[in-house]
Amino acid sequence: MKFDFVYLGQTVLKYQVPLEIFVGLNEIYERKKKQLPKANKQLVGKIQDEVSLFYSGPNNDKMHQHCFLPDDILKWFHSIFDHYTDWNKIGPTQKSINSIWVNEMKAHEYNPVHIHQGKLYTGLSSVMILKLPKETGVEYSAEEKPMNGRLQIIVCLLYTYPS
């Protein structure tokens, strides 16, 4: 398993996704995107096309349980979360994947700063970028190291002000 370690207070591991998992997720999304449940009501993104591939939480007015993913892809996600908790010496734990969705972002759409919550105190969340557009816009501030189209992880915001 190939991964990089980034220490930001909490551990962030960046995994290399096997090609068959990457291709499988893209194919499922492209083939079934019109029949996948809309996920907008349960997500904070300012994104028109947000659809769910997997949901195992309680049925509610926003989402019902479903699975459009084959066992091999789900097993791969479980192996990543097992590796993360083992590597960080967290355990023993009960792990369950609550949801997996796709955000198909277009120009001017974005995900605002937000948090993910779960039953495990580490708050495991994952992001996988399936496709990037060829053009991500003009890089105004750092032409030598463009950041457009990159995932930015914000660990903590601290506001200090006089009382």
Please annotate each region the language model reported.
Residues M1-T93, H108-P112:
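Non-heme Fe(II)/2-oxoglutarate
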Residues D72-M147, Q152-V155:
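Conserved double-stranded beta-helix
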Residues Y159-S163:
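Conserved small/polar residues in nucleotide/adenosyl-binding loops
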